[in-house]
């Protein structure tokens, strides 16, 4: 894992002063590293009968689509409001200073389908908690929330069903 961690670069003071941003684009643009990351994540779920992989806008699409392909599952997109063309299920959730809303097509997950949620990074857990609620409300059976990386010092997993959280890389 250290070789993958070493490829992710730190960008100081982005998006604002005092934050050290973990830039995953360096890992994604390196074919061997990207393939290794997807192989490591997908290996965890082989044989777990995943029906749908939920990818969270926007970098979760990059990981979710590749995992869905490897697992023979469908991909479901969770997007910001107004980006999906059909009827949507909406979830508004609290941020540190305000609220945000996510949407998913109402027919994207059927009752009883086994769902893997994929995103690039677990930080505070607010977004992922909202997505878990959406999957639950639609009748999906959450297998796990998987992340390429986790910022452990932000304690995001405390907002999630901890036994169903997996992060490949931890910072």
From Swiss-Prot:
It catalyses: AMP + diphosphate = 5-phospho-alpha-D-ribose 1-diphosphate + adenine. CDD domains: PRTases_typeI (cd06223). This is Adenine phosphoribosyltransferase. One of its GO terms (cellular component) is cytoplasm. Gene3D superfamilies: 3.40.50.2020. One of its GO terms (biological process) is AMP salvage. Catalyzes a salvage reaction resulting in the formation of AMP, that is energically less costly than de novo synthesis. It is an enzyme of class 2 (transferase). Its main location: cytoplasm. Homodimer. Its EC number is 2.4.2.7. The gene is apt. Pathway: Purine metabolism; AMP biosynthesis via salvage pathway; AMP from adenine: step 1/1. It is found in: Cytoplasm. Belongs to the purine/pyrimidine phosphoribosyltransferase family. One of its GO terms (molecular function) is adenine phosphoribosyltransferase activity. Keywords: Cytoplasm, Glycosyltransferase, Purine salvage, Transferase.
